[in-house]
Amino acid sequence: MLTSVRPADVVLEIDLSAIQANFQTISALVGPQVRVAAVVKSDAYGLGLVKVAGALIDAGCDLLFVGNLHEALLLRSSHISAAVAVFCDEFARYGEHYRSNGLIPVVNNSVELDAICGAREPQAYFLNVETGLSRLGLAFDDVRRRYLGGIFKRRPPSVVLSHLACSERAGDAMNLLQWNRFRATSDLLKPTLLSLAASAGVWLGKRYHFDMVRVGSALYGLNSAGIRPNPLKPVVGVKAKTLDARNVARSEAVGYGATFRTGRASRLAIAGIGYKHGLPWACANKISVRFAGYSAPLVGRVSMEYITIDVTDVPEALCGPGTNVELLSDDFTVDDLAASAGVHPQEVLTRLGVGCARQYLDGSSASAGFPGNLTNAGPGHDPRAILG
């Protein structure tokens, strides 16, 4: 009978104090008159919803945005009492769960708006309006028609929000176009509070801040707007273990497809991390890792559970079986890894969060993904049971 399991060999280290510092940086940027809401959807971008939410509340955050009702109920079952808004889930179906748990639905279409306004009890809600992303939200004509019908006088939204499509590019004409559309729509709903900017949008200037900004990726150290020098603290590191090391001759092929051949007699180390853990397949032959400060290139393709590293110039005592391999650090961040692979940093972060064992710098740990975190829920409060 198996009674114990050795610790995970691939660890995602998460610095909660860095998340708090990034929250304070954004708060200082927008000023005290602008509310900073934290976006913790998708399990806090893979970093652990409950842990991250608690750290943000300790830093002064009083409003959290989650992706769905499942996440909202997980927060409530974990005794998170801050205001929680749900980006997208069925109020018409789950209205009682919203009301009994003090949750705020984001209304994205006319069906949801009718359900809100037709409810016997008043329900606070945020109204999402479509300004150019072509994803979710009421179009201007729908808002105007409902305005003329008096629905917003009877049940006004607490906040009107929209989402910028091109905020990572400060000079893109879409930003001003969406600002003008948002302003035209929101003018119908005065004096409702307004929110347009997310993480990259906060760097577009005060006119985009309105009453509230919704910050996600910036909290987790991602500099999607490319601000230099980067004012955000790195939040995560990734470490794996060396499994084996071997000497090979010059001109030997390495990995699937023989995409790399040794240019000299070389020593190669095999580390137990691959695309299963969230390391992008496309970073093959493009990045370097570290052994106790020594840099060594990844050579050959990224496999499902392994990578190969040229450690010829690393002292053997530092790169033998069982030694640590550092893939992400303050010097080589998620942004850098994503750029090397030609993918979005948010994709890299969320995949690492699912594929690696999380370890928080306060010494605690958590399993990746929701099933492990649901152990925080009290008896009878499993969100999966509530929602069926």
Swiss-Prot record:
InterPro entries (alphabetical): Ala_racemase, Ala_racemase/Decarboxylase_C, Ala_racemase_C, Ala_racemase_N, Ala_racemase_pyridoxalP-BS, PLP-binding_barrel
Modified residues (N6-(pyridoxal phosphate)lysine): K41
Alphabetical keyword list: Isomerase, Plasmid, Pyridoxal phosphate
Catalytic residue positions: K41, Y256
SUPFAM superfamilies the record matches: Alanine racemase C-terminal domain-like, PLP-binding barrel
Cofactor list: pyridoxal 5'-phosphate
Pathway the protein takes part in: Amino-acid biosynthesis; D-alanine biosynthesis; D-alanine from L-alanine: step 1/1
GO MF annotations, alphabetized: alanine racemase activity; pyridoxal phosphate binding
Reactions accelerated catalytically: L-alanine = D-alanine
Residues annotated to bind substrate: R135, M304
EC number: 5.1.1.1
Superkingdom of the organism of origin: Bacteria
Entry GO CC: cytosol
Transmembrane domains' residue ranges: none
Enzyme class: isomerase
GO terms for biological process, alphabetical: D-alanine biosynthetic process
Role of this protein: Catalyzes the interconversion of L-alanine and D-alanine. May also act on other amino acids.
Protein family (similarity comment): Belongs to the alanine racemase family.
NCBIfam families: alr
Designated name of the protein: Alanine racemase 3
Organism: Mesorhizobium japonicum (strain LMG 29417 / CECT 9101 / MAFF 303099) (Mesorhizobium loti (strain MAFF 303099))
